[in-house]
């Protein structure tokens, strides 16, 4: 298969003689290579064509939409129509390069692609740069970074679903960054499509003129070539940088390649960059020589230079991914005094933390390498080593949300074959001490005990979010009950006149949001509700640490921080569930749930009894009593010194949802 695709000559990393399978190549990658390298221009022709296009004919744009409204499908059609890839029924999610993206049908990592468009109206060529961004709220950092290199965006709305929560959130993000927005109604070919209603919602919610809205079908390509592409050229402004100014570029993204090291995705704000020139990274003050640079088409195509207004990749021979700070400014060495540093991006903070441990202790070293390798390509994950008395050596991982954590785990299992035991997700709590100092607790094991709380802690605070929920009016009662049951505080309720839709705004504890709130919301609304949220800071809360004790010994990996009103219910569920996975011992096993100093629930596993009277004669009463007393004393001693044997499978089963 590799020979027929001609990959050996095109990609030496796949091997020549003595070929072996590369660890980063899977069936999805091979199919993508086959699709992407199907364009008809050589590298020299691509470079020559770019050089003949003036800066005023550049258009950098993104696609703004809710999850599953057709961003990736529209990207595929644009790539086909502009000739980047051939028309092929297998062209699905071409820019979604991760296996987990294709399986889940979502975009996780923002991807970019340059396209050539020939406008028959004036006979001119245009250089279009598309960013396919994620729609889920967990990956909003990817979205905001992508918008920074764009002059405009397509506001995409599903004709059958209308405006949803994340459509609104991403619209305001794009609007606040000054992007020119082109409203587009997608899926107009569906039988259930209500195009006029979708247009009315766009007009009402975003105050965009109805006559500017374009109806398309990303699946069939209807109106994409005839209406959408000319509109992109007409309405989205070209980049405003100056070619004569000293070179400077904004570092938008980075990823790690085992052969080239760290590859940077940059937006050229001013000037020009050529291969062989020396550049300085402002954040680290480190200097590098440009080894290779070019555009994504949609894979790397070396062009020898990048000029103002272009978005492309740069290879500097950088080996440590921590040196690539997203939002950093790149400039020519020696031009530091005449080059202004760009504002950059606000660094995203993790909102969810989990403990991760190998399913068997012997796998720690190999899995440590796998996790570090994956973190290289996802800079939003924080990583620290931690040790558990119950589960041994592991890691404390920080994520942007529960979907982000789930995707990371799935990538680790699918791409590296690594199996993890993941603890319950926890959120960062703030502890304010009596002496005025503050600290953030991300591990329940570090939560202050009862004595410390009495003597040194002024107050405990937990993070809250403002959740925006869009749903049909018929499910309003169910969703309000769900929010109230999760300690929510209703702030606003808006009825959308167009089609019986309601927008709810609630203040919710982040801890409840990451505890499968989205799944519960889908169940309460039969899948029709959509959710968006934003951080609104910390609030004082009566939270306590709930521990699971086995014969008086706390199992640190299972501890959780909960509101005091929830500990009894959760504690009873815990001890009942954990009892199922602990095998009976030769002595009595007591399983307890403890909140602070109070035991809130208990279960007992009776001792496994050995028949010491089996060989006795029935009439030997004194001997019988003596043996039973001896057994009783032995069990008493065993209970005081014996350790309960709990295997890893028990923890894994207990933590599994």
From Swiss-Prot:
Q: Which InterPro entries match?
A: EF-4, EFG_III/V, EFG_V-like, EFTu-like_2, G_TR_CS, LepA_C_sf, LepA_CTD, LepA_IV
Asked if the keyword Membrane belongs to this entry, the reply reads yes
One Gene Ontology biological process: positive regulation of translation
Q: Name one GO cellular component term.
A: mitochondrial matrix
Enzyme type, top EC level: hydrolase
A Pfam family (short name) is: EFG_C
Write out the entry's keywords from A to Z. GTP-binding, Hydrolase, Membrane, Mitochondrion, Mitochondrion inner membrane, Nucleotide-binding, Protein biosynthesis, Transit peptide
User: Which GO molecular function annotation, any one, does this entry have?
Assistant: mitochondrial ribosome binding
Q: Which reaction does it catalyse?
A: GTP + H2O = GDP + phosphate + H(+)
Supply the Gene3D superfamilies for this chain.
Answer: 3.30.70.240, Elongation factor 4, C-terminal domain, Elongation Factor G (Translational Gtpase), domain 3, P-loop containing nucleotide triphosphate hydrolases, Translation factors
Q: Its Enzyme Commission number?
A: 3.6.5.-
| SUPFAM superfamilies associated with the record | EF-G C-terminal domain-like (SSF54980), P-loop containing nucleoside triphosphate hydrolases (SSF52540), Translation proteins (SSF50447)
Say which family it is in. Belongs to the TRAFAC class translation factor GTPase superfamily. Classic translation factor GTPase family. LepA subfamily.
The identity of this protein, by name, is Translation factor GUF1, mitochondrial
Organism for this UniProt entry: Candida glabrata (strain ATCC 2001 / BCRC 20586 / JCM 3761 / NBRC 0622 / NRRL Y-65 / CBS 138)
């Amino acid at each position: 298969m590799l020979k027929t695709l001609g990959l050996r000559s095109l990609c030496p990393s796949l091997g020549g003689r003595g070929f072996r399978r590369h660890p980063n190549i899977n069936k999805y990658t091979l199919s993508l290579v086959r699709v992407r390298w199907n364009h008809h221009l050589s590298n020299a022709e691509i470079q020559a064509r770019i050089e003949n296009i003036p800066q005023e004919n550049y258009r950098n744009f993104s696609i703004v939409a809710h999850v599953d409204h057709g961003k990736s499908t529209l990207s595929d059609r644009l790539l086909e129509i502009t000739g980047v890839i051939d028309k092929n029924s297998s062209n699905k999610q071409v820019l979604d390069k991760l296996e987990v993206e294709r399986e889940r049908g979502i975009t996780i990592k923002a991807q970019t692609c340059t396209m050539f468009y020939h406008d028959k109206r004036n006979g001119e060529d245009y250089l279009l740069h598309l960013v396919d961004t994620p729609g889920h709220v967990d990956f909003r950092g990817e979205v905001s970074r992508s918008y920074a290199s764009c002059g405009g965006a397509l506001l995409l709305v599903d004709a059958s679903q209308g405006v949803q929560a994340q459509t609104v959130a991403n619209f305001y993000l794009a609007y606040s960054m000054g992007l020119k927005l082109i409203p587009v109604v997608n899926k107009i070919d569906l039988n259930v499509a209500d195009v006029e209603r979708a247009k009315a919602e766009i007009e009402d919610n975003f105050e965009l003129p109805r006559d500017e809205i374009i109806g398309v079908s990303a699946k069939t390509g209807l109106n994409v070539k005839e209406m959408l592409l000319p509109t992109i050229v007409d309405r989205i402004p070209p980049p405003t940088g100056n070619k004569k100014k000293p070179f400077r570029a904004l570092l938008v993204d980075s990823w790690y390649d085992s052969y080239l090291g760290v590859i940077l995705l940059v937006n050229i704000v001013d000037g020009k960059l050529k291969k062989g020139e020396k550049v300085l990274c402002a954040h680290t003050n480190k200097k590098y020589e440009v080894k290779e640079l070019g555009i994504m088409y949609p894979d790397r195509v070396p062009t020898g230079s990048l000029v103002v207004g272009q978005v492309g990749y740069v290879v500097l021979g950088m080996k440590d991914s921590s040196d690539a700070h997203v939002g950093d400014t790149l400039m020519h060495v020696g031009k530091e005094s005449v080059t202004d540093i760009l504002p950059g991006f606000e660094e995203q903070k993790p909102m969810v933390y989990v403990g991760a441990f190998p399913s068997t202790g012997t796998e720690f070293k190999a899995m440590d390498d796998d996790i570090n390798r994956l973190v290289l390509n996802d800079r939003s994950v924080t990583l620290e080593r931690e040790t558990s008395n119950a589960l041994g050596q592991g890691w404390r991982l920080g994520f942007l949300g529960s979907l982000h954590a789930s995707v990371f785990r799935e990538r680790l299992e699918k791409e590296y074959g690594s199996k993890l035991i993941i603890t319950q997700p926890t959120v960062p709590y703030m502890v304010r001490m009596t002496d005025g100092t503050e600290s953030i607790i991300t591990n329940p094991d570090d939560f202050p005990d009862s004595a410390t709380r009495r003597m040194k802690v002024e107050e405990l605070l937990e993070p809250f979010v403002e959740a925006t929920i869009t749903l049909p009016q018929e499910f309003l009662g169910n969703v309000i009950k769900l929010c109230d049951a999760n300690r929510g505080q209703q702030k606003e309720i808006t009825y959308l006149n167009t089609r019986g839709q309601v927008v709810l705004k609630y203040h919710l504890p982040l801890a409840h949001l990451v505890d499968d709130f989205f799944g519960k919301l889908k169940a309460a609304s039969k899948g029709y509700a959509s959710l968006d949220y934003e951080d609104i800071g910390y609030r004082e809360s009566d939270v306590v640490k709930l521990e699971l004790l086995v014969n008086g010994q706390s199992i640190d990996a299972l501890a959780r921080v909960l509101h005091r009103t929830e500990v009894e219910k959760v504690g009873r569920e815990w001890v009942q569930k954990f009892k199922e996975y602990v095998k009976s011992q030769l002595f009595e096993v007591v399983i307890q749930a403890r909140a602070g100093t109070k035991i809130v629930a208990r279960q007992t596993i009776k001792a496994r009894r050995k028949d010491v009277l089996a060989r006795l004669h029935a009439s030997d009463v004194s001997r019988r009593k003596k043996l039973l007393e001896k057994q009783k004393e032995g069990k008493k001693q065993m209970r005081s010194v014996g350790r309960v044997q709990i295997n890893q499978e028990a923890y894994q089963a207990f933590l599994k949802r």
